[in-house]
Amino acid sequence: VQTCALPIYFRDRARAFREGFDAAFADLCGGADVYYAGKSMLTLSTARWAAEEGLRVDTASGGELAIALAAGVDPAHIGLHGNNKSDAELRTALEAGVGRIIVDSLDELTHLAALAAEAGRRAPVMLRLTPGVHAHTHDFIATAHEDQKFGLSLAPASTDRDGNVAGRSPAAVAVAAALAAESIDLLGVHCHIGSQIFEAEGFGLAAGRVLEFLAEIKAEHGVELAELDLGGGHGIAYTAVDEPRPAAEIADALADDVQKTVERLGLTCPRISLEPGRAISGPAGLTLYTVGVTKTVDADTPDGGTAARRYVAVDGGMSDNPRPVLYDADYTAVSARRTSEAEPVLSRVVGKHCESGDILVRDVYLPADLGRGDLLAVPATGAYTHVMSSNYNALARPAVVA
């Protein structure tokens, strides 16, 4: 098994986001900043490609921050995410001079302020908010519900627990605390509504709610925050039924929504940023497997009958791509070594792990003569495969060729 990362695809997708959003927001707020979400696939190469295409880099741990810095990314163009950053991670970010630290809670804000004061620095902070927008996506990867670990709610708190003030939103309390802290430089706010999103409506709704919150901040504190990050979640085509919109179309629709809202609220448009990850790295990756055992079984059908299903086992599985197991993610597969005139038959591509759920592609038509030693290619595996891989069953992690 081997994962191939194709620079030309990565660069093309990165450029499409940068140019599309820059053009859409040029007149409104001087353009947009695109942060590549490194959690989707971060290596020295992908960090360097992103920077060379004019993107910034979003990291989610001290390890990812170290990779971005080692790749030569300008620290001022790096963001550090994470709902539970360690002291070491925060101190490293402060010492390196990262451009933004995205803060998820009042607890973290208070702690970061103390660390920054101790270091004699001002921490550049974006407050992550949960706008209550529910994207049409899998429950396990939706991140804008109120009952979840990320962000500060825009809804009023019901109790005074953990720094909350009953009747006041945790987001409003955090903004007041950030503005009052001498060691905090409050740049703006951030939100993220989910993953694998194909339409622009969700982003526009989230932007509207957050901009209304910025208007409340202006009214209460006399301050207009300068930046608004709308996160990532832009979808890609894993199979033929997926139809994501081009980056430029999403950008144009979002810019129109933002312009109408800032004009209605009497706000100066904040600098817009976004964090595509999968949308850039996903299509740039291709996993090659070697076929081993094949067998045909009788499978039950919904009408009570039976149908033949062919199982195609490969030399990898859930250790190199856990997404089908974790999220019921769909992929497709094609024969990669040779052409075949054999009839395509309904097949299920499975891994070699000691797990009945070790399924890579649930239903796909593959040549009936596909057999031992043939190569099978699974496209769109550039995101959340290699970075989530493991050594389960003591299998080796596959190499990445870039």
PLM region spans:
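Active-site-proximal beta-alpha core segment in soluble small-molecule metabolic enzymes
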Residues: A26-E227, D257, V262
